[in-house]
Amino acid sequence: GGLSVALFEPRQVGGTCLNRGCVPTKALLHGAGPGCDWPALAAEVERVVSTLRAGQEKQLRAAGVELIPYRAVVTGPHTVEAGGAAYEAAHILVAAGSEPALPPIPGLDTPGVVTSDGLLSDLRPLDRLAIIGGGVIGVELACVWAAAGARVTILEAAPRLLPTLE
């Protein structure tokens, strides 16, 4: 047999892309438009994400991966603690995922300023939207709200949008 594997995930299996990035934005792009039904669109996004997440969880369990719904803390060269329990391992791989980065701009703590995670967790029509960051998620979110009729401005420090793409 192979190695035994445990996956510590305090949020949701699938990470940023599945839960708060690529997948929800693609589902939004598919359904957004003038006069779109935002509650129905939000329900469809959740249905798509939940279905794919359940599929990932099923695949992981079928492969023998133990899913542990806690944040892990490495406490030694071969020890991880999570949820009040200690786990021993010959090898520890840290794949910490990502969070939206906040640039050092005064005023980002003002009410109404949200990260992409916040925007995706509160889907609703907007008249105007300023997006700081012209990466993939920023551009996709801009397209969603523009398609729904919002006036959208993207602010990007690089000379062009999508600066990490060729």
State what each model feature region is.
Residues 6, 13-23, 50-132:
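FAD-binding core/adjacent interface of flavoenzyme oxidoreductases
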Residues 11-32, 160-166:
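Conserved N-terminal glycine-rich FAD pyrophosphate-binding loop of Rossmann-like flavoproteins
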Residues 1-16, 148-161:
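Glycine-rich FAD pyrophosphate-binding loop
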Residues 1-6, 35-42, 87-89:
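Short intrinsically disordered, low-complexity coil segments enriched in acidic
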Residues 1-2, 28-32, 80-82:
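Alpha-helix C-terminal capping segments
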Residues 25-47:
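Glycine-rich active-site loop/strand segments that organize a redox cofactor
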Residues 47-53, 57, 120-121, 126-130, ...:
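Rossmann-like dinucleotide-binding cores of NAD(P)H-dependent redox enzymes
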Residues 27-30, 44, 91, 144, ...:
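Alpha-helical scaffold segments in soluble metabolic enzymes
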